[in-house]
Amino acid sequence: MEKKLSAMPYAQAKVRMLSGCYHNELISYQTTVAAIRDGWLHIYGLYSATTRRHIGAYVKEYANIDYQLAKKLYNDGMKYNIYTGEVAPI
């Protein structure tokens, strides 16, 4: 099942739900740019300014964090547990 981001319903981004709320992916244009798997948020790339806005809306809606933290996680090669707030290396 695919959903639009609540904050950006007209954007060229969608969230593909793979196993309920435990496993989903953010697809910006044609590229998977972030995912939550078993509660762990992974950011795969920051790409364009528009894609960064998509990532910001996704992490706010699904991980309850802001874009700046998501960017830091990506730059530091870390993943984030959306339930506990734990940060771990990828």
Model-identified regions with their sequence ranges:
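Terminal leader/tail segments of proteins
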Residues: 1-90
